[in-house]
A protein has these predicted regions:
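Short, intrinsically disordered or compositionally biased N-terminal tails of bacterial proteins
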Residues: 1-7, 323-324
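A composition/secondary-structure signal for short, hydrophobic, low-basic-content segments
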Residues: 4-7, 26, 45
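Bacterial N-terminal signal peptides that target proteins for export
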Residues: 5-17
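Bacterial N-terminal signal peptides
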Residues: 15-25
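Intrinsically disordered low-complexity regions specifically enriched for long asparagine
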Residues: 26-28, 433
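Boundary at the C-terminal end of the N-terminal hydrophobic targeting segment
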Residues: 29-34
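Alpha-solenoid helical repeat scaffolds
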Residues: 37-58, 67-436
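ATP phosphate-binding glycine-rich loop
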Residues: 62
Length: 436
């Protein structure tokens, strides 16, 4: 018998039992100033029961540990013991036991948000959606103002993994019945219902939810965001909700979302107007300058686009040492590529090359190399251009094929037909199944 090992394990279990019982705060590894003495509700018998429960859990008998812990929780009316009972039940994947403990916890502490969230998680995890109405109502109990709106907004996330999305939408609508007709909470509540209806594939129902939410308050953000999502889902009537919202004191993020939706619909002039409005209303909103510059290349010309793109870059955090290998952000990559394109159009290949060299992005490395190689070829440096392409790192599965195709095209563009044919023959032998 390993006496010292047994004593060490027993002392550890006593410590765990004390923490679970709430006698010792978590993380109390060092001596601290004495706290005021408070009498524990636990007597010696309950302490012994908790210790036995922890020993059972330590030895793999979680079922017995659960029963002992739940009994102790009821007798001591201890939130920490109730939570421990839930944890033990979940450890053995017993949803029924976990739900029993969580509901007992809630009966003992009706206002406990932790107990209610365990109940929600267990019911959702076991697809017992019809039992969720009351727990959802309790999640909102006692909340008002922004706290209530914020909680309503996150409720749809609880249902991301449920299989019956239509039932989930109906349950949430029932739980929010008291909020739906109100001016203060109705827009958020209807939008939450609309999000659930989108998940269920009910686009007409989602549009109705957006319309009802906006009817309560046309300046509310939630129906406008829902309507934006419906625009992406090809529901044209949703645009009227967004446009009405944008006539007020609109958030730039929502106007930006509308602009992107317009770009997706190839309504570029309208999208440019939205970007210009953001630039006027909130000049430090960087992304609007980037999108504006991207649109102006096609519409207003290189000079206007260059000004917008440089304004975008000026709003980003200051660049570090040029030798710093910190990866360039996605927006900055796009801006540098567009500015390099403008420099090429203006007949400034050296400036274009310098802009491309500022991009430090592994995923764009080949793309940037191809652009730089094209610049070299235009300056009569075809051999250097080919060498740059061949030496470019290969990070994706198709990069080798892309490099070969790019080099062939470069040779064709500069009338090196013999070398292009030789390289094409190599490509056909290397990639016999490639019909491109």
């Amino acid at each position: 018998l390993d006496y010292y090992g047994l004593m060490h394990r027993t002392q550890r279990l006593i410590a765990i039992a004390s923490v679970v019982a709430g006698l010792i705060p978590f993380g109390s590894a060092q001596a601290v100033a004495p706290a005021p003495v408070t009498n524990s509700d636990l007597n010696a018998g309950l302490m012994y029961q908790i210790l036995v429960a922890e020993m059972s859990a330590f030895n793999g008998d979680e079922t017995n540990a659960f029963s002992l812990t739940l009994d102790a929780a009821r007798r001591a009316n201890s939130p920490r013991l109730y939570e421990r009972a839930v944890e033990l039940a979940l450890r053995v994947r017993s949803a029924d036991f976990a739900l029993e403990a969580a509901r007992a916890w809630q009966r003992g502490f009706p206002s406990s948000k932790d107990a209610n969230r365990y109940i929600l998680q267990i019911l959702i995890g076991t697809n017992r959606l019809s039992e969720l109405t009351e727990p959802l109502k309790r999640e909102l109990q006692g909340l008002s103002g922004k706290d209530r709106v914020g909680t309503i907004n996150v409720l749809p996330r609880y249902f991301q993994r449920v299989t019956d999305k239509a039932l989930a939408a109906a349950v949430l609508e029932q739980a929010l019945a008291a909020d739906l007709p109100t001016t203060l909470y109705g827009p958020a509540a209807w939008s939450a219902v609309g999000v659930m209806r989108i998940g269920a594939g009910n686009l007409p129902g989602a549009l109705e939810a957006a319309q009802r939410g906006a009817a309560l308050d046309a300046n509310a953000e939630e129906p406008a965001v829902l309507a934006l999502n419906l625009m992406d889902a090809k529901a044209p009537a949703a645009e009227a909700i967004v446009r009405k919202y944008l006539t007020g004191n609109a958030l730039p993020e929502i106007r930006m979302g509308y602009g992107r939706a317009l770009i997706g619909a190839q309504r570029f002039a309208a999208a440019l107007t939205q970007m210009q409005l953001i630039n006027t209303q909130k000049p430090d909103f960087a992304d609007a300058w980037l999108v504006r510059g991207s649109l102006e290349i096609q519409d207003k010309g290189p000079a206007a686009a260059e000004k917008s793109l440089k304004q975008y870059l000026s709003l980003l955090p200051a660049e570090q040492d040029p030798n710093d290998e910190t990866e360039t952000g996605r927006g900055a990559v796009q801006a540098y590529l567009l500015l390099a394109q403008i420099a090429e159009l203006n007949g400034k290949p050296d400036e274009a090359n310098a802009l491309l060299q500022r991009i430090k992005s592994p995923q764009d490395a080949l793309r940037v190399t191809v652009r730089r190689a094209t610049l070299m070829a235009r300056q009569g440096k075809l051999d250097e251009a080919r060498a740059a392409i061949r030496n470019a790192p290969e990070r994706q599965a198709d990069d080798a094929r892309t490099k070969l195709a790019t080099e062939i095209q470069l040779l064709r563009d500069y009338k090196q037909m013999s070398e292009a044919y030789t390289l094409l023959t190599t490509a056909v032998q290397t990639y016999p199944d490639d019909n491109t």
